[in-house]
From Swiss-Prot:
Gene Ontology biological process terms from the UniProt entry: L-methionine salvage from methylthioadenosine
Keywords attached to this entry: Amino-acid biosynthesis, Isomerase, Methionine biosynthesis
Enzyme Commission numbers on file: 5.3.1.23
Similarity annotation: Belongs to the eIF-2B alpha/beta/delta subunits family. MtnA subfamily.
Protein name, UniProt field: Methylthioribose-1-phosphate isomerase
SUPFAM superfamilies linked to this entry: NagB/RpiA/CoA transferase-like
Protein's organism: Geobacter sp. (strain M21)
Length: 346
């Protein structure tokens, strides 16, 4: 791939600014955890796995900022760093997974001097990024096997290299099928209000010379009804124990339409996106974002001033609409509660 979503370089976090794509390919440098938290909140970096990586790297930066003379003092301040980052995006479980993983590293090495702990935290954050790339390629391999030759694939939002360390989850499946020579083509929903499909998915696929057609969100049902879609695949921000899946707002509509038109609908996500502590999707917290994201596009007002707005960033697709969940360990179908628990236990 010709871009890097996020990396640690010279004790700085480097992230591609996704708010400026596709017009500009700009990389921002971050040297403190507060600025990383703001980048997560402001959608400079987005997509559950990428948010998890950014959170971990933010903790590593925060650890370098802490002044302490004992582990207990250091760890209390590290928890404060994690609390600040943890308040940025409530739905993506990878955020909290990354924070907990970093805290665990500190606790497991509390007998070491603080500089050694800081170095271990940096190494852990880099490992999370490296692991994610390998995980996405495994997801792509498992998912590509499900795609028929010449398939037309619909995807929603952006679950690609920009949403991960690279390669992607849903777009990992698409990349895997493309690399296998299956002659696929992709339809990308524009994905209001942030237009991740138009700005990010189309940009990624065009850079990789994967045939892509951009559609407005309200076209998806008609394309399915007229036989122009063979396969649907999306990413996930959190998957409950029963398979209910939170993903970008509009995913639920796509899933219902797919079932009505007998089109397979798959979710592609790493095991770190599973939240088996939540029995079902009704318990997943849904982030509500600013009204201006709906009433404006790039600062231009497109709705009457003062109109009431709802802007949930995610919806929840019940498991009954999901054909299968593609993970790095394989594809889960049917009894999600039992199968997901078994998968995590492997």
């Amino acid at each position: 791939m010709s871009f890097r979503t996020i990396e640690w370089r010279d004790n700085k976090v480097i992230m591609i600014d996704q708010t400026r794509l596709p017009a500009e390919e700009v990389y921002n440098e971050y040297t403190d955890f507060q600025s990383v938290a703001q980048a997560i909140r402001g959608m400079v970096v987005r997509g559950a796995p990428a948010i998890g990586i950014a959170a971990a790297m933010g903790v590593a930066l925060g650890a370098r900022e802490i002044i302490a003379d004992s582990f207990d003092t250091f760890y209390r301040q590290l928890e404060n760093v994690c609390d600040v980052i943890g308040r940025t995006r409530p739905t993506a479980v990878n955020l909290f997974w990354g924070l907990e993983r970093m805290k665990r590293v500190a606790l497991q090495h509390k007998e070491l001097d603080l500089n050694s702990i800081r170095e271990l935290l940096k190494a852990e954050a880099i490992s999370i990024e490296t692991e994610d790339l390998a995980i996405c390629k495994e997801i792509g391999r498992h998912g590509a096997a499900l795609v028929k030759e010449g398939a037309s694939i619909l995807t929603h939002c952006n679950a690609g290299g920009l949403a991960t360390a690279g390669y992607g989850t849903a777009l990992g499946v698409i990349r895997g099928a493309h690399e296998a020579g299956k002659g696929i083509r992709v339809f990308a929903d524009e994905t209001r209000p942030w237009l991740q499909g138009a700005r990010l998915t189309a940009w990624e696929l065009m850079k990789d010379s994967i045939p892509v057609t951009l559609i407005s969100d309200n076209m998806a049902g008609w394309l399915m009804r007229t036989g122009q879609i063979d396969f649907c695949v999306v990413g996930a921000d959190r998957i409950a124990a029963n398979g209910d899946t939170a993903n970008k707002i509009g995913t639920y509509s796509v899933a219902v339409l797919a079932k009505e038109n007998r089109i397979p609908f798959y979710v592609a996500a790493p095991i770190s996106t599973l939240d088996l502590k939540l029995a079902n999707g009704d318990l997943i917290p849904i982030e509500e974002r600013a009204s201006e994201e709906v009433t404006q596009i790039k600062g231009i007002q497109i709705a009457p001033e003062g109109v009431k707005v709802r802007n949930p960033a995610f919806d929840v697709t019940p498991a009954r609409y999901i054909t299968g969940i593609i993970t790095e360990k394989g594809v889960v179908r049917g009894d999600y509660e039992r199968e997901l628990k078994a998968l995590v236990g492997q």
